[in-house]
Amino acid sequence: MPRLTGLLVNNLNNDQRALFETLTGGKRSIGRSLDAFLGPDGAMRGPFNAMLHHPAAGAVVQRLGELLRFEGALNDAQREVAILTVGRHWRAQYEWWAHARIAEGVGVAPDLIQAIYDQAPLPGDASDLTAIHTFV
């Protein structure tokens, strides 16, 4: 059972609607349909639904996430290894679910993703990814 009530798109107030448009129309939406953001009940998935419950704070969190993900110094594979490492450490199920697929899509080897999940030494010769994983 979810900890927060799922907010349906048709029931959003103006502030929530503005944040919804930012989340689903920004850099995260490139190559994704609106359905990628919505669960089977029609509410936003994962952390996005929580952001909609407090749109002012949600807008700040969204911008920070966008900055780190899309405007940071790490390349895509390095960023995803960092996200997966933190997500696995904290047993963040949604983060793992979402970013394991993204990581594989940006070229992170499936055996490396599995090693992070298993909390095992990283395989292969990906020294930059191993350095990121060790640092995080």
Task: Place the predicted regions along the sequence by residue.
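A short structural micro-motif
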Residues: 67-68, 88-89, 119-124
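Mobile cap/lid helix-loop segments that border enzyme active or cofactor-binding sites
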Residues: 1-74, 127-130
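Aromatic-anchored, charged helix-turn/loop surface patch used as a conserved interaction hotspot
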Residues: 34, 38, 104, 110, ...
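Juxtamembrane/interface motifs at transmembrane-helix termini
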Residues: 38-40, 99-105, 132
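Conserved alpha-helical segments that form or flank metal/cofactor-binding pockets of metalloenzymes
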Residues: 57-60, 74, 80, 86-112
